[in-house]
Amino acid sequence: MTAFPAAPDLAPPSRAAQGERVLCAMSGGVDSSVTASLLKEQGYQVIGAMMRFWPDDKRTDTFDSCCSPDAAYEARRVAEQVGVPFYLLDYREPFQRHIVGPFLEEYARGRTPNPCVNCNTKVKFDELVKKAKMLGCRYVATGHYVKRVDNAQGEVEFHRGDDPRKDQTYFLWGTPRDALPYILFPVGELEKPQVREIAAERGLLTAQKPESQNICFVPGKVQDFVAEHLPQAQGYIREIATGEVVGEHLGTQFYTLGQKKGLGLYQSHRVRHVVHLDPDSNTVWVGDYDDCLWTGLKATDANYLLDLAELPTELEVQVRYRTAPVKAHVLHADAEGFELEFAEPQFAVAPGQSAVLYAGSRLLGGGLIADHARELPALT
């Protein structure tokens, strides 16, 4: 991980010296376009950059709009509109190594990955920060809907963006703590309609560009992408209460906890949910809604954006994007991981997803949800 110099005298962005150099991550979307424009207007020396992820042997339509060659063309045109230099940076190898490979490996293990978290942690705020230092930049800026707060102690905190529908702090829990002072989020205090209005006022060509909805390297359904890269393996679907075989499947990688549609059971007059995936025995276990309720979780690969000793024992945790955080009690926390007890049982807490910690609007850190240990009927 990149080592950052100490910066006790770092001024908040609102008081930053004129002409500070900033590397602005551009995606060809409206958020990063406005980010570059606002920074330029605030007196920063802006360098626009887009990270190339798509390989040469892929069709241009195999990557979503935020990562495609067309997006690179639009990002370059916006940089010209704003009046800043633009670089297309080759990150194909790190992207395959850190993002696509682990994404498929997690599905093969019966887990549900979130590649956007890995991308921010291991590519954008690691590889891109290294490039920023090489270019003599003091800051990296992105179009994330996240608020940077410089507190009274001179420390930088990340808080939820002012637009609750667009808040993206969930994806940034893995940001190295020593990188926080060097990251700017110019649109974090804006709502999406305001961002589009700013883009329109400045004549930016991305002002009305539709938002990206998919995982950038998955052009369609995740199941289709997984099927293309992981071999099928026929196995049984079993009832968690009895061990009875109630159906067949073509691989545990095609299922996720809580799933109730597309199970293909032999016959069932009750709604069944996926409650456990066991790739070792190639078994998909199903049961009632209550079988998917969890009273707590354990997380690994933890990262904290404050001193561990300052982590409150009562906090909030968010276990998937676009769901409300829930109150939780910290049973244990160390540098490697943590264990939480929910105030109320939670449905389908999926291993591989992120457990993200908050105190009010402040992002405290997070970890990867660990596999659940549970007793299973003997296989016959």
From Swiss-Prot:
Enzyme Commission number(s) from the entry: 2.8.1.13
Disulphide bond pairs: C119-C216
Subcellular localization, as worded in the UniProt entry: Cytoplasm
Interaction with tRNA: annotated segments: 166-168, 320-321
GO terms, biological process: tRNA wobble position uridine thiolation
HAMAP family on file: tRNA_thiouridyl_MnmA
Annotated family: Belongs to the MnmA/TRMU family.
Name listed for the protein in its UniProt record: tRNA-specific 2-thiouridylase MnmA
Gene: mnmA
